[in-house]
Amino acid sequence: MTEQTYDLLVRAPRLFCADSGLDGPGAVAIRGDRIVASGSGVEGSAHTVLDFPDALLLPGLVDLHAHPARGQSRFGIDPDIHFLPRGVTTVMSQGDAGALNIDDYRRTVIETSRTRVLLAINLCKRGETHPVRCFNDLADADAQACADAIAADGRSIWGIAVTVTGGACADGLDPRPIMAAGLEAAELSGKPLLVGTRLKPDWPRREQLPLLRPGDVVTYSLNALPENLLDGDHIADDVWEARQRGVLFDLGHGMNSFSFPIAEATIAEGFLVDTVSTDQYNRHVDSRPQHDLPRTMSKLIAAGMAEADVLARATARPAEVLGLKGEAGSLAPGACADLAVLRWNEEALPLRDVNGEERLGGCWEPVATIRGGQVV
């Protein structure tokens, strides 16, 4: 039998792929930008062989909510500098561009980045270019302009970002018409919503979640602010009802939206976020320890989530939500050859939530990234 020859062969003592069911020692074989074989029985030679004897080999990580941008957004950071070297091969922008600047964003970020970048286009027509907030008045929430921009060129646009938090809306501005405009844009375009719900008592969560539809994603899910997922010490009934209707829940860590007590309470009740994301943006640059997706994943492990559940929610599950099942977030033959290599550091700095609470334990750290068959 003729021996197979590959461009790249990557070996590790543990491969994990929720999409194909892999969890054990093996190798991934790559030709061009495609995975052609994976698992324990992969044999053959390759032009380049990489061995990682003490690491975990995963599909390239998928960050469903962050801020990849180059100058177009008050939050933006370069995806090829701040995501790709940290194991993230696919990242979605939460509203860095809107109808007025989507063409510039596509030209300067989506089309020029080595990282795969998707966009949840902002309902605010200027995106995140305002130095303070999205919505200064209701005219900023232009459903028709948003839908028209998607209809004109929907490439790489996953859905629509609607954020009605206190930080996104001017003081005194009613968030309800903004949410209504987002839902209108979603109906006009046939796209899902990525929603930052109101986290203030002026609009209770129980009035917001029933507005959302199957496939819509709620982000900032594990915050300790008012109107979080809990009523008292338990998951609220309306949160369970939203999940049963098909509404999805994303982490969206950021600067304000990860609390260990909230995470621990939700996990203890069996309510796991659907996707693990960083909401990484320019305030995180040069943070110590560095905020990234592997560290965010490690925090959920420390909070009690099973490791396999965490790994799936940073790879296969967000890829599926983004419509990339079989292309990203997978080690199955035929998938794009995007890989992340992580190593567990038991001596890492303590894991800290946004309120300063710490949990001891190790942390996943990035070792290597492969994007489209090329080592980064």
What residues fall within each predicted segment?
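N-terminal metal-binding scaffold of metallo-dependent hydrolase/deaminase domains
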Residues: M1-G44
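Divalent metal-coordination and catalytic microenvironments
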Residues: P13, V28, D33, D54, ...
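Metal-associated gating/positioning segment near the N- to mid-region
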Residues: E43-G44, F52-T112
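Hydrophobic faces of well-ordered beta-strands that scaffold small-molecule active sites
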Residues: V62-A66, V91-S93, V117-I121, W158-V162, ...
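Metal-cofactor-binding active-site regions of metalloenzymes
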Residues: G76, R86-A97, T112-L138, A161-V164, ...
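Active-site core of metal-dependent hydrolases
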Residues: G166-S287
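His/Asp/Glu-enriched, well-ordered alpha-helical/loop segment
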Residues: P261-W344
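C-terminal cap of metal-dependent C-N hydrolases
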Residues: C336-V376
